[in-house]
Amino acid sequence: RVLLAEYTKIKYWKQLAALFGSLEDNKRELLALDLTYQQNGLDKEKQFVALAYQFMAIDVPYRAAAILERAMKEGQVEKTEKNLEILGSAYQRAQEFKKASPVLEQAAKLASHGNAWSRLAGVYLNLNENEKALVAAINALSKGGLKREDLTWMNRGSAEASLHCYDAAVKSFSKAAKFDRVKKNAVNWKKYVSAEGERRNKLIANGANLAQCKKV
């Protein structure tokens, strides 16, 4: 702190950030890193990514996204699958779904696993793009290696229900119900879509002109 009062060189902010990091003082490390960033003092990809992670950790995802996007545009952060997924995740958490979708689409095409596709399914559901959500969920499950397979099945079931594919949705929610983390919610959704499917089938049988399953 004495150094900072006497000197304004960027290297001192960097050193202070490293010191706070070694002491696991995350708040002060973030402050020092951010001040370094504002003075254009970050010059390594890992520094930009670390700063973005820190803003996400304190629930300021839009700031994290802005830092990463600018760094990518300026060539300071490579557009790898991992970095794109971090950027897309930041926009998703900031509820900037229209900005999240094209980024996650890029990440999904580069990834060997299905995690970006899984995130993309959730983003598409929030944009009410149910056909795309279903395709993304199917792709995620097909690629595998998922951190949250339970949520992927939930998103798939939600997309299928929105497309009036109730039998398929029942199967997806049954799959989701095998995971303790979402079991209660999945069982409730399974009951709802099963009942809704039966209700609509009866109405259609009696001559009602209702939308039917829209397969993708």
Kindly label every feature range from the protein language model.
Residues R1-L163, A168-K171, K175-R200, N206-V216:
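Alpha-solenoid helical repeat scaffolds
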